[in-house]
Amino acid sequence: MVIFPKNIDGYKKLIKISTFASRRGFYYYPRIDYKTLKSFWNDKDLKLAIPFYDSYVFNNTLYSNLCVPELDFTEPVYFLEDNDLPFDELVTKKVNNLSKNTQKTQSIYYKNKKDFKAYLTYKCINNRSSLDKPELDHMTSNEFCVESWKEKNNG
């Protein structure tokens, strides 16, 4: 999930959420439970977004996970992406069944297509794997860059 501040009060709430997650919810990385998040929440100041690839919808669809987040305190916006990957259509259908509150987005991880190998090397180092066998699901496209986004949007 991604939390966006809508104004200065939202920014202040986001700092409180982040501080709580870092100090009281830390377990290898900052985290917060839904009950606590709900206690900080105000739709006037904050907006919740559900990413396309790194989300419960994606994991439930592709890996048969059974995550059901408690989102009764807000109406999140769901990000949609189309990167010509085989599962994009499956996840898009699931998202559209969940909500009409969607926004087309594009994940960007590096600047140019030629930078993909450097990005993959970085991911392999973090994953403790090698370029010969990266063991990174769906890391098959060099289209997650500014260059590809410009091509799609500027003709």
Name what the model sees in each region:
Residues M1-G155:
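Phosphodiester-processing cores and adjacent nucleic acid-binding clamps
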